[in-house]
C-alpha cells in the first residue's frame, strides 16, 4: 500500500511490465525452420508446412491434430510422395491437379519439370523477436502458362508470374495467405480460368457453416448429388468453413476485405461442399474468379503490364462447445480482421497501407415520380470503369462491367436509408461510382472518380433520376437483382423444382394485375412446361428433358384505348433461353433476344448476371377494358428458361 501511495508511477510501470511479460509467456515466439522440401512455421498454437516446390499448404496442425485431409506417413508427416505438391494430374480427381490439402489453383510451379520455383524467407522471425514469419514461393513465368488446377490444361493455363505467401504471427490461431500475380509487358495474350484457394479438410469435419441458411450437419455419407445447391452470395459471407462435432474444432476462411474478389456484392459462388472424389473431403473454397453464374474474367493483352494481389485472407482455426459457437466465433473474428485491414505487415509496393488509401463519401438523392421514402438495401461501389476485354481474333467487342470483372479491384459499402454512404480503405486509382437499391429499376453511375493516396473525397449530393419511358401502367416483382420475392424461390435448392412447375401450374401462369400476388402466383422460373413423366434431374446438368412452350399470361385493365408507344421493361437475373416472345391481345409485339446465358436455372440459383432488356410496341395493340400480354418461352430442354427480377409496362402517349 505504501508503494502505491508514494510511487504511483512506478506501480503503473511495474504492472505494465508484469502483464506484458505474462502475455508474452502465454504466446510463444514464432519459429521458422526448413528442410529440402518444406518450410515449417510454428507459433505454439498452429504449425503449418508449405511446399517449396509449389506454394501448396501441405499441413496445418492445431491442438495436435492435422486439420487438412493430407495423406500422412506412419509418423504423422505429410506424405508428399503419395500426393506430390504442384502439378499432379494423377491425383484422385484425375486429369487435373487437385490435392488433399490446401492449394492455390494457380501455384508457383507451373507444368512439372519446366522451371523451379524460388523459395525464400520474406519475414524472418529471428530478426523481429519472434513476432512474425513469412515465406514466399515465387514462380517466374518467362512465357510459360502457370496453373494446372481445376479447369486448366496439363500444360498450364495463365501466363503470369506468381508469388504465393504464407504469414504467421505470434498468438495467431491460423495463417494468412495471399498471392501476387504479375503479367509482364513482354508476355503474350493470356486468359485466366477458374481461380481460387481450396482447403480440403480432415475427415472429422462434419458440420458446414457457409451462411445462416446453410449451416448444418454434413457427414461423409450425406450424398447431396449436386454441390450447386450450396452456392451463396460471397459478399454476405466473409467467414465460412467447417467444424467438427466430435473434436469441437473449426476451420474457416476469413476475407477481411472483398476488394480482390470478383463480381461485386451480388456474386454467387461456391464457399463449401464435399469433394466429388471417393475421399469426399470437406472443402472450403475462396474463389476470386470463376465461370459460375455468368462468371467473371481476367483477360490480359500481349504487351499489357497487369498486377493484382489476392488477399491476404486468414485461414482461421478455433474451438468451441458446439458448431454454432464455433461459427459465431469465426464471424466475430471476421469483424476483428476487417478492422485490421489493410495489414501493416504486408510489404509490397502494390499493397497500399492505411495511410496510402482514402475515403469516398456522398449522398444519393432519388428523383422519381413513384418511388419515395428511404433507400432500402442501398449498395454503393467504386469499381474499374467499364472496359473492352482483350480477345484474340474477336469479331465483336466484349465489354466488361463490375459484375463480370475479376481483373481489377472493387470497393463496396452498404449505404444508409437517407442515401448517405462512405466507402473506406480505397486504393488510389480511377473509378466509376455505381449504386443500386431495392425498389428502383436500374443503377446510378458517376464516372471519373480519381482517388489519391490519403486524400478523402466528399462527392456531396448526387442526384439520381431513374430512367422511365413513360407513365407506369403496372409492374410485377421488386427490382432487387434477384427473384427472392417470387413463388417457390425459397426452394431453389430443390434440384427438381423446375419439374414441379408443370404440377403446380398445369394451365401455366395467369397473373391478374391488381388481384394476383407475385409471391404466390408467379413461379420464379419461367421454364418450358414438362410433359414427360419420365423426366429426371441429373446432378450438375439439371433437367435435359424437352418441355413444351410456356406462356406466362398477364391480364390488366385500361380505362381507355391508349395511343403512342408502349415499353415493356425487364430486369433479368437468370438466363438460359435463346429468346422470349411477347404477344399483346393475341398479336406479336416483339421478342426478347440477345440474352446473356448464365446457367442459373440448371445450377439452382435465383440470381446471376443482372441486366435490363425492353420490348417496344405500338400502344394501339392494347384496348379499353381487359388486355392480355403473354411472355412465351419456346419449346426446349427444361433448363432453358428465364428468371425475372422485375417487369414493368410503361406508356408514352406524347
Description of each model-found segment:
Residues 26-93:
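Beta-strand-rich N-terminal accessory domains
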Residues 92-181:
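Extended, loop-rich substrate-binding clefts of extracytoplasmic carbohydrate-active enzymes
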Residues 358-369, 419, 462:
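A short, amphipathic beta-strand motif
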Amino acid at each position: 500500500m505504501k508503494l502505491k501511495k508514494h510511487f504511483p508511477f512506478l506501480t503503473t510501470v511495474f504492472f505494465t511490465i508484469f502483464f506484458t511479460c505474462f502475455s508474452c509467456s502465454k504466446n510463444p515466439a514464432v519459429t521458422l525452420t526448413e528442410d529440402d522440401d518444406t518450410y515449417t512455421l510454428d507459433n505454439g498454437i498452429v504449425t503449418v508446412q508449405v511446399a517449396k516446390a509449389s506454394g501448396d499448404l501441405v499441413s496445418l496442425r492445431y491442438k495436435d491434430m492435422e486439420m487438412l485431409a493430407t495423406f500422412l506417413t506412419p509418423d504423422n508427416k505429410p506424405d508428399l510422395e503419395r500426393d506430390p505438391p504442384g502439378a499432379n494430374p494423377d491425383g484422385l480427381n484425375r486429369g487435373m491437379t487437385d490435392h488433399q490439402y490446401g492449394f492455390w489453383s494457380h501455384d508457383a510451379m507451373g507444368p512439372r519439370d519446366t522451371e523451379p520455383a524460388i523459395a525464400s524467407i520474406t519475414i524472418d522471425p529471428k530478426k523481429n523477436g519472434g513476432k512474425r514469419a513469412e515465406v514466399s514461393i515465387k514462380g517466374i513465368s518467362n512465357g510459360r502458362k502457370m496453373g494446372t488446377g481445376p479447369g486448366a490444361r496439363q500444360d498450364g493455363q495463365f501466363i503470369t508470374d506468381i508469388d504465393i505467401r504464407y504469414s504467421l504471427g505470434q498468438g495467431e490461431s491460423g495463417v494468412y495467405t495471399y498471392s501476387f500475380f504479375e503479367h509482364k509487358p513482354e508476355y503474350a495474350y493470356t486468359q485466366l480460368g477458374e481461380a481460387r484457394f481450396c482447403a480440403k479438410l480432415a475427415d472429422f469435419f462434419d458440420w458446414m457453416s457457409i451462411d445462416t441458411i446453410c449451416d448444418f450437419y454434413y457427414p461423409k455419407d450425406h450424398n447431396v448429388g449436386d454441390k450447386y445447391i450450396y452456392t451463396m452470395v460471397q459478399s454476405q459471407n466473409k467467414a465460412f468453413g467447417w467444424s467438427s462435432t466430435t473434436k469441437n474444432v473449426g476451420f474457416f476462411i476469413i476475407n477481411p476485405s472483398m476488394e480482390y474478389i470478383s463480381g461485386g456484392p451480388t456474386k454467387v459462388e461456391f464457399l463449401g461442399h464435399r469433394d466429388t472424389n471417393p475421399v469426399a473431403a470437406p472443402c472450403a473454397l475462396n474463389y476470386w474468379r470463376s465461370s459460375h453464374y455468368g462468371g467473371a474474367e481476367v483477360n490480359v493483352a500481349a504487351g499489357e503490364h497487369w498486377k493484382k494481389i489476392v488477399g491476404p485472407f486468414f485461414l482461421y482455426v478455433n474451438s468451441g462447445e458446439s458448431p454454432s459457437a464455433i461459427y459465431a466465433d469465426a464471424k466475430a473474428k471476421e469483424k476483428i480482421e476487417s478492422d485490421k485491414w489493410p495489414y501493416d505487415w504486408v510489404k509490397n509496393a502494390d499493397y497500399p497501407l492505411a495511410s496510402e488509401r482514402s475515403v469516398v463519401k456522398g449522398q444519393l438523392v432519388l428523383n422519381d415520380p413513384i418511388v419515395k421514402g428511404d433507400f432500402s438495401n442501398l449498395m454503393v461501389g467504386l469499381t474499374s470503369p467499364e472496359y473492352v476485354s482483350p480477345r484474340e481474333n474477336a469479331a465483336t467487342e466484349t465489354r466488361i462491367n463490375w459484375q463480370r470483372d475479376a481483373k481489377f479491384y472493387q470497393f463496396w459499402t452498404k449505404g444508409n436509408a437517407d442515401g448517405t454512404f462512405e466507402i473506406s480503405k480505397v486504393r488510389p486509382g480511377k473509378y466509376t461510382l455505381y449504386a443500386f437499391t431495392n425498389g428502383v429499376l436500374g443503377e446510378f453511375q458517376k464516372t471519373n472518380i480519381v482517388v489519391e493516396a490519403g486524400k478523402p473525397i466528399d462527392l456531396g449530393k448526387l442526384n439520381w433520376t431513374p430512367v422511365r419511358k413513360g407513365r407506369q401502367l403496372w409492374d410485377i416483382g421488386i427490382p432487387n437483382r434477384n427473384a427472392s420475392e417470387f413463388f417457390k424461390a425459397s426452394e431453389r435448392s430443390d434440384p427438381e423444382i423446375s419439374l414441379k412447375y408443370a404440377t403446380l401450374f398445369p394451365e401455366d401462369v395467369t397473373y391478374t394485375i391488381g388481384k394476383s400476388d407475385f409471391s404466390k402466383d408467379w413461379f420464379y422460373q419461367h421454364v418450358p412446361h414438362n410433359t414427360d413423366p419420365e423426366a429426371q434431374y441429373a446432378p450438375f446438368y439439371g433437367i435435359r428433358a424437352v418441355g413444351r412452350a410456356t406462356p406466362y399470361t398477364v391480364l390488366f385493365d385500361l380505362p381507355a384505348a391508349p395511343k403512342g408507344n408502349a415499353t415493356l421493361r425487364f430486369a433479368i437475373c437468370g438466363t438460359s433461353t435463346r429468346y422470349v416472345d411477347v404477344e399483346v391481345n393475341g398479336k406479336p409485339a416483339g421478342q426478347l433476344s440477345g440474352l446473356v446465358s448464365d446457367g442459373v436455372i440448371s445450377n439452382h440459383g435465383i440470381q446471376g448476371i443482372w441486366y435490363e432488356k425492353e420490348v417496344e410496341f405500338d400502344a394501339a395493340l392494347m384496348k379499353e377494358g381487359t388486355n392480355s400480354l403473354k411472355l412465351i418461352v419456346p419449346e426446349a430442354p427444361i433448363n432453358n428458361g428465364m428468371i425475372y427480377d422485375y417487369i414493368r409496362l410503361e406508356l408514352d402517349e406524347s
